[in-house]
Structure formats: C-alpha cells, structure tokens
C-alpha cells in the first residue's frame, strides 16, 4: 500500500508560484523569509507579537465593496480569475463588521456621504480605506457639480489613493499591495 516509486513523490513543493517571475510567492515576504531562516537554523522562531499580528493581518485583508460608479466594474474584475486578488490574501466581504478595508470606487454625492461615514464607523479597528478612481479621489469629471463631494477624504480618512478614470485592475492590485506594505511598516499597535 505504500509508495512503490519514491522518485515520483514530490518532496519539496514550491507552493504558490508567481507566474510573472516563476518564483515562489513567499520569497518576497521578508517576515516569512526571516522566520523560515530562523526555524532552519535554530529550530524555533523569536519575534514580537506586533510583527506576528502585522504579518497575519496583511495576508488576510477582507475588503468591503463600496462601488458607486463605473470604477466598481474594475474593482469586481480584480476578483475574477485573470487577476485573482485572493492569491494576495485579499477577499471581498459584504458586511462592514467583517471587513478591514473599504474600497470607495466612484462618485461620492452629498446624499451618500453620511451613509459612507456610517459604514466606515461600523468597521472594526484597525480599518483602512482605499480611494479608487478620480471621482473618489477628488470629484473627477463631476468636480464642479453642487451635489458631489470633492474627494472621499473629506468624509473618511484615506490610506491609499488609486488614480485613473477608471483605474485598471492592475492599479487596484498595486494599491492593495501598497496597503499591505503600509500595514507592515506602521504596525497595528501604533496606529
């Protein structure tokens, strides 16, 4: 019942491989690389709780969709198989109480601003906001309209701005990766 040919058994799989570079995805993570080096040298890992929390938080960001206009189509595209945002540890959630990141995509009107703030207040700490597209960043095409908020940063604090009209799915993924780097850099206890 055992393995008859041990040459056919894969002993050391590379894990998730980045298709662009053909390098395992975990090799880009400095914390993970340091932990595996310590584990290989000593047999155990020493770290601070803050570093461990930051590492786990960056790999499990749950984003809530707040799609207001055409940018929401590009936001949905990041979850599709071509870009697959979940390979970076980011997954969509429908409830603000279960999400860490809110992506504001599209034109924010004065009537929608209180609802945006209410949803933001329902998110647990630490919470992050990505402003996606020209309309969410500064009003965009409708900047001079009486009914448009000239940037969602007037309502909620924004961590990452993704420019474009509409920004591509690659730009949003770059913004998500920039947010992950920001979380690693600033920490959760210091925020």
From Swiss-Prot:
It is an enzyme of class 7 (translocase). Its EC number is 7.1.1.-. It is a peripheral membrane protein. Its main location: membrane. It is found in: Cell inner membrane. Binds 1 [4Fe-4S] cluster. [4Fe-4S] cluster binds at residues 70-71, 135, 165. It catalyses: a quinone + NADH + 5 H(+)(in) = a quinol + NAD(+) + 4 H(+)(out). The keyword NAD applies. It comes from the Bacteria. GO terms for biological process: aerobic respiration; electron transport coupled proton transport. Keywords: 4Fe-4S, Cell inner membrane, Cell membrane, Iron, Iron-sulfur, Membrane, Metal-binding, NAD, Quinone, Translocase, Transport, Ubiquinone. GO terms for molecular function: 4 iron, 4 sulfur cluster binding; iron ion binding; NADH dehydrogenase (ubiquinone) activity; NADH:ubiquinone reductase (non-electrogenic) activity; quinone binding. Its cofactor is [4Fe-4S] cluster. GO terms for cellular component: plasma membrane; respiratory chain complex I. Pfam families: Oxidored_q6 (PF01058). Belongs to the complex I 20 kDa subunit family. NDH-1 is composed of 14 different subunits. Subunits NuoB, C, D, E, F, and G constitute the peripheral sector of the complex. NDH-1 shuttles electrons from NADH, via FMN and iron-sulfur (Fe-S) centers, to quinones in the respiratory chain. The immediate electron acceptor for the enzyme in this species is believed to be ubiquinone. Couples the redox reaction to proton translocation (for every two electrons transferred, four hydrogen ions are translocated across the cytoplasmic membrane), and thus conserves the redox energy in a proton gradient. PANTHER family: NADH DEHYDROGENASE (PTHR11995), NADH DEHYDROGENASE [UBIQUINONE] IRON-SULFUR PROTEIN 7, MITOCHONDRIAL (PTHR11995:SF14). NCBIfam families: nuoB_fam, PRK06411.1. This is NADH-quinone oxidoreductase subunit B. The lineage of its organism: Bacteria, Pseudomonadati, Pseudomonadota, Alphaproteobacteria, Hyphomicrobiales.
């Amino acid at each position: 019942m055992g393995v008859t040919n041990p040459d056919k058994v894969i002993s050391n799989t590379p894990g998730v491989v980045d298709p662009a570079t053909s390098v395992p995805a975990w090799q880009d993570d400095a914390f993970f690389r340091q932990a595996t080096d310590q584990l290989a040298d000593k047999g155990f890992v020493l770290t601070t709780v803050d570093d461990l929390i930051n590492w786990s938080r960056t790999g499990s960001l749950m984003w809530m969709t707040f799609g207001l206009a055409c940018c929401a189509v590009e936001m949905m595209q990041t979850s599709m198989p071509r870009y697959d945002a979940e390979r970076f540890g980011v997954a969509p959630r429908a409830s603000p109480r279960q999400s860490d990141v809110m992506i504001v995509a599209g034109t924010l009107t004065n009537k929608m601003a209180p609802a945006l703030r209410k949803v933001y207040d329902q998110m647990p700490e630490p919470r992050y906001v990505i402003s996606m597209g020209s309309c969410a960043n500064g009003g965009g095409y409708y900047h001079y309209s009486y009914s448009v908020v000239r940037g969602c940063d007037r309502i909620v604090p924004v961590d990452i701005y993704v420019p474009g009209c509409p920004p591509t799915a690659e730009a949003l993924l770059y913004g998500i990766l920039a947010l992950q780097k920001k979380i690693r850099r600033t920490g959760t206890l210091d925020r």
